Amino acid sequence: MNQRKKDLFLRTFSRRNFLKAGFLSSAVFLMDGCNLFGVTTPIDTIKVLHVDLFPKAKQLGVITAPYMHIVFQHPRISTQDKEFIKNGVKWLNEEAIKMFHSSYTKLSPSKRQEVLKAISQTKWGDSFIYNIMSYMFEAMLGDPIYGSNNHEAGWKWLHFSGGEPRPKKAFL
């Protein structure tokens, strides 16, 4: 392998890139007191959470959860923000376990709403919901080139036209 190919390979498959790419699919261990209750991933919980916080997204064709993969690979998203989202997923699931003895993703929609109402009364929960909803609106209102605002559905829903000039390639 020539040096140029070797350098490209090492940049592409570095430990840092591997860890960044796997952030939302990494395991989150859920505890019930001192006992291990189960395991989930941030992306699995975020997919359900997005439906609960913005039920119209699916009907509109706005796919918000995969957008999180793109965003969390961007170097401008701080490690602290990433960790807060991951911890928020853990805390959300642990609240569901405390209230209903089940992880958040396995609850009925009405029970998930009860969990959301409960955590919204806490400082961390209010901040977590705010952060998740910020990313959801970013996905819904972003340029379709990023893959979440399919067919400009979010724009059409709000009777909005995107900014000009439109990007020719994704910048994330």
Pin down the residues of each PLM region.
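Conserved aromatic-histidine-acidic binding/catalytic patches
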Residues: L10, F37, Q80
